[in-house]
Swiss-Prot record:
The lineage of its organism: Bacteria, Pseudomonadati, Pseudomonadota, Gammaproteobacteria, Enterobacterales. It comes from Salmonella typhimurium (strain LT2 / SGSC1412 / ATCC 700720). Mg(2+) binds at T26. This is Elongation factor Tu. Residues 174-176 are annotated as: G5. Residues 10-204 form the tr-type G domain. Keywords: Cytoplasm, Elongation factor, GTP-binding, Hydrolase, Magnesium, Metal-binding, Methylation, Nucleotide-binding, Phosphoprotein, Protein biosynthesis. The modification N6,N6-dimethyllysine is found at K57. Belongs to the TRAFAC class translation factor GTPase superfamily. Classic translation factor GTPase family. EF-Tu/EF-1A subfamily. Residues 60-64 are annotated as: G2. Monomer.
Amino acid sequence: MSKEKFERTKPHVNVGTIGHVDHGKTTLTAAITTVLAKTYGGAARAFDQIDNAPEEKARGITINTSHVEYDTPTRHYAHVDCPGHADYVKNMITGAAQMDGAILVVAATDGPMPQTREHILLGRQVGVPYIIVFLNKCDMVDDEELLELVEMEVRELLSQYDFPGDDTPIVRGSALKALEGDAEWEAKIIELAGFLDSYIPEPERAIDKPFLLPIEDVFSISGRGTVVTGRVERGIIKVGEEVEIVGIKETQKSTCTGVEMFRKLLDEGRAGENVGVLLRGIKREEIERGQVLAKPGTIKPHTKFESEVYILSKDEGGRHTPFFKGYRPQFYFRTTDVTGTIELPEGVEMVMPGDNIKMVVTLIHPIAMDDGLRFAIREGGRTVGAGVVAKVLG
């Protein structure tokens, strides 16, 4: 089994299918695994294996998602597909399946439909950086002009939401015909895989990003100073480096004088590791859970932002009643709750359980944040919603 070992050295990229119901997302997912397995090796997955997606929980929300994997000669892909529209909304907002790029499936027989638009908008709001289009069911359209018209509509729609519509790769194919083994249409799946390789850049690994550690706990160690603990979210912290303590209070500077893990002293702490960081000249009471340690200048505290949120339905353990403007829940960021007020979009009077909505949030304390940060909405410790920072406002 030397092949397995070899795969690990390939860059790993996360993708997923998005688009309107019944436009062929799951069929395309099956076709990609089947055609690539046949061409480059790997395991094919049948349509029905993908379609009955298992339930998973992300931030207390139940989502049905199918995960498949496939390889091209240069990369390894993890691919998510969701059976229902609501699952997509939840998946994208919670970031349960973070996508480095998405394949937008549009049936040539229908053209763009309401969920096509909604998924593109969600992609923009939650920070899906790249979209490739698969124009499906092209075997059912004889009219070249009609295909060109649909293509133009899709490009315009992408441009409307700030994706580069004119430069977006569009593949004309038939997922069903490819799945049935028709060579002409199989070639279109290979073409799509080629665009995944060339159009979606290799994602930056967490370890290569600037250092950030959400503070979970603070201890005072007599004779040594103050230690904060938490899991390094990204980057590397080395002994002797300057750090900033950001959020809740005024930003403070300090120097890391020690890193420890499992009571052992280390030279550095890396993304994914649970560590204690010893800070010079900081008193125990000057720092608290909910702040972050970060590489100086890389993240700022903010109180106001535009967000895209999903409100849990009653069945999911959420609220039983709608809420209105002036609603003041807690927003849970990384390790702490902060109270905030909301502004609803113009013309929206109330939000029902099960809805997804754009809202502007103003927090009572600043939190270290960037666009794309995920949060939960809570009432008295119970999760009632999930959201993502679409745009920091102040």
